[in-house]
Amino acid sequence: MSKVYDWFEERLEIQAIADDITSKYVPPHVNIFHCLGGITLTCFLVQVATGFAMTFYYRPTVTEAFASVQYIMTEVNFGWLIRSVHRWSASMMVLMMILHVFRVYLTGGFKKPRELTWVTGVVLAVLTASFGVTGYSLPRDQIGYWAVKIVTGVPEAIPIIGSPLVELLRGSASVGQSTLTRFYSLHTFVLPLLTAVFMLMHFPMIRKQGISGPL
């Protein structure tokens, strides 16, 4: 086993990387509120795991979506638990994200030289809200249907581009199969990919610049 480790160590300097990760200085003013971002990340990872598990059984069609969710809840082994954890962690992720944004703002974590960290964080907050909107429509129940109809109908009040924008969001003039397909694609592929990209930008900047000092 040591020979295998030595082989990787010689090429990748694993020990140096581990030492850098574990020996990072933590300022004395750091408290539990500085963990909110990490909790948000944990919730996201739970979302990815449970969401991936449900894609094996969920059917993104207007005729089968609701029935497939019911099947997950009643027939799939531990399906009720997986979906429940997905919903609970989604709510927790949004709450932790909001608290994290407030903590960073109130402690001045957005100021120079951390402007780009703040910008990527705001983008991640928007992506988190988008997860909520797109995910809400997937069960294709009454609450999800009317929520999506209202949310996608909001841009219609914008002069000139309002109606085309609504049609772009829905895929048609009304909420239907095209809307569900778009929201499913956004929820399971586009948004997770964008979130991963911005996290890979966000975390190295935090690592490089460190935690902002006390007020």
Curated annotation (Swiss-Prot):
Heme b 1 binds at H100, H202. Its cofactor is heme b; heme c. This is Cytochrome b6. Binds 2 heme b groups non-covalently with two histidine residues as axial ligands. Binds one heme group covalently by a single cysteine link with no axial amino acid ligand. This heme was named heme ci. It comes from Amborella trichopoda. SUPFAM superfamilies: Transmembrane di-heme cytochromes (SSF81342). GO terms for cellular component: chloroplast thylakoid membrane; membrane. The chain crosses the membrane at residues 32-52, 90-110, 116-136, 186-206. GO terms for molecular function: electron transporter, transferring electrons within cytochrome b6/f complex of photosystem II activity; metal ion binding; oxidoreductase activity. The 4 large subunits of the cytochrome b6-f complex are cytochrome b6, subunit IV (17 kDa polypeptide, PetD), cytochrome f and the Rieske protein, while the 4 small subunits are PetG, PetL, PetM and PetN. The complex functions as a dimer. One of its GO terms (biological process) is photosynthesis. It is found in: Plastid, Chloroplast thylakoid membrane. It comes from the Eukaryota.
